């Protein structure tokens, strides 16, 4: 069982990775299988990440999910098939207990990190709660988000750095935030790929800089980061599973120094 005490160990590195959203069972299972193979070989604890729905899209016709229950059942199947814990986002208070029946970690999106009722609902499930730092917040302000969860009697908190707004269409990572948030006594996660988003594009779809993934990961390691989120989108035309296998090997190898 995934426990927050195990994740707090200074020498523990673990990886949260998977598709941005659950788009179909075959894709999710194949991605999980590839990453489990890689992380088992490198002896890295792994948590499968996949949103069962995406509620924070720019356009009303953007993809949001395949159906809540269908996607949650896929997350449960991945956990049972591969023996790995799972994490998914929640967006509303009623999502908390529903998702908690299927996954091990509830994740609070960055845009929602100050929503008290949502944080309280997540805390009351007794699950680990990963709160992503809002692009508009200082690292030190995240202590208040964490305290809302702790005050509910749940000390299973993780905090995630995912970049800070830098103008209208870009993000920048201030790596001072990693050691600053670690002083609160909770594991700090580095969301490598979302830190490279370029939001507010004229197309209504966020862009990104995937060629800088390794740079962001290496810099986080130097900042005493030991936990990473890596996710991919299937919007590209190439084989998602093949691409994910290659990208995961490169990413994991970068941060642990075991693969060229």
Residues covered by each model-derived region:
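N-terminal amphipathic alpha-helix/helix-capping segment at the start of soluble metabolic enzymes
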Residues: 1-16, 73
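Short beta-strand segments at enzyme active-site cores
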Residues: 15-16, 44-51, 85-90, 190, ...
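Active-site mouth loops of central-metabolism enzymes
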Residues: 17-30, 58-66, 84-89, 108-110, ...
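Glycine-rich, proline-tolerant flexible connector loops at the mouths of alpha/beta enzymes
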Residues: 16-27, 46-68, 232-243
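Catalytic alpha/beta core domains of metabolic enzymes, predominantly
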Residues: 8, 125-232, 236
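Catalytic beta/alpha-barrel core
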Residues: 66-67, 81-95, 104-117, 128-139, ...
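Alpha-helix-loop-beta-strand connector modules within alpha/beta enzyme cores
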Residues: 33-42, 61-87, 122-128, 178-188, ...
């Amino acid at each position: 069982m995934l426990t927050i005490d195990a994740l707090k160990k200074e020498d523990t590195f673990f990886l949260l990775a998977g598709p941005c959203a659950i788009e179909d069972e075959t894709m999710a299972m194949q991605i999980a299988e590839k990453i489990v193979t890689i992380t088992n070989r490198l002896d890295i604890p792994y948590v499968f990440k996949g949103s069962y729905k995406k509620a924070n899209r720019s356009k009303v016709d953007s993809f949001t999910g395949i159906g809540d229950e269908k996607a949650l059942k896929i997350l449960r199947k991945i956990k049972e098939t591969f023996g790995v814990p799972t994490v998914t986002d929640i967006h509303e208070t009623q999502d908390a207990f529903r998702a908690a029946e299927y996954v091990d970690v509830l994740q609070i999106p960055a845009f929602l990190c100050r929503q008290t009722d949502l944080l309280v609902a997540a805390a009351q499930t007794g699950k680990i709660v990963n709160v992503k730092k809002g692009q508009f917040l200082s690292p030190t302000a995240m202590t208040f988000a964490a305290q809302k969860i702790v005050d509910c009697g749940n000390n299973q908190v993780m905090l995630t750095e995912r970049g800070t707004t830098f103008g209208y269409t870009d993000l920048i990572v201030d790596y001072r935030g990693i050691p600053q948030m670690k002083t609160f006594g909770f594991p700090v996660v580095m969301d490598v790929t979302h830190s490279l988003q370029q939001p507010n594009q004229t197309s209504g779809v966020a862009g990104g800089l995937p060629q800088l993934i390794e740079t962001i990961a290496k810099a986080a390691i130097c900042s005493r980061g030991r936990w990473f989120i890596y996710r991919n989108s299937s919007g590209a035309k190439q084989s998602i599973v093949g691409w994910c296998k290659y990208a995961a090997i490169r990413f994991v190898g970068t941060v642990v120094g075991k693969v060229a």
